Amino acid sequence: VIIDAPPAHRTARLGTVLCWLAVTPTALWAAARLLGLDRGPLVQALAFTPYVAGVSVLILALALALRRWWPAALAALTAVALLGTVAPRALANTQPTAAGPTVRLLTANLLAGAGDARTLVELVRRHQVDVLTVQEFTPDAQATLDQLGLDTLLPHRQLNPEIGTAGSGLYSRWPITDVGVRRNLEGWGFSQAYATVSVPGGPPVRVESAHPSAPYALDQVGAWRADLTAQPPATPDGGLRILAGDFNATLDHSPLRALLGTGYVDAADATGQGLTGTWGPYDGDLIPPVTIDHILVDHRIAVRSVQV
């Protein structure tokens, strides 16, 4: 009577189990990403899809090295699916033909007014920024920025400073019209300053400082989705629009992809910088950087370069 499997058989079975345990979670992740199943805790998790795409390649290599062909087949499908959604962000896209003027736009989350105002003004000066959008904009931040000379560099503005994180602002080198502030009705109730910028030698451009609610907890996911859904769509048959700010979402979140589908282009994605992180890590945490800040431009606008 055989009461135990031979050592070689036990080792083979262990290798098979190991492969399936490694492949299955990434395959489910790929399914959630492709099917747009960003609900509940998956909303936060899917922000890290680029890292999981890298892991999926290692899992495929493991399955092939162990000669586990069925797990390897699933791992290959998973890697192709994830890399197919992520890798194009590192490749520059063909830009539309544009002969108009150059507009340099900068966006910054001021961290409830605690951001480095001096560095921000220096960036505006050094890069000759034409339009600046800010989020988490406070009265103290407004005063400090003006003391540092921002009111001279960008004299036209639509500002809504608030204590805390709900404030918003838009600064411009050129005159602005049709100014206003829109309030997100869910979650934190972040405000979004907007204006139509009169670009010399070009058509006017509607610019808005975007700041939907953050899905920082499960009970905030609904507010996050509602705020993203309420963002102004592109107007491909009308005037040019730009949304710039802290979207609290990555290109792996379906509400942001739906917004892009109205006629926007993600500027970083268009220039091959779509995998550059804009948030994290902070305060010594172990969270790797994710890309939640974006500049979305009308698809008729050519994007020449992006820096983070």
Report residues per predicted region.
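Soluble catalytic domains of enzymes that build or remodel membrane lipids, polysaccharides, and related
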Residues: 105, 111-125, 134-308
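Residue-level marker of positions within ordered structural domains that often coincide
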Residues: 1-2, 36, 50, 176, ...
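N-terminal, active-site-proximal structural segment of metallo-dependent hydrolase catalytic domains
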Residues: 2-148
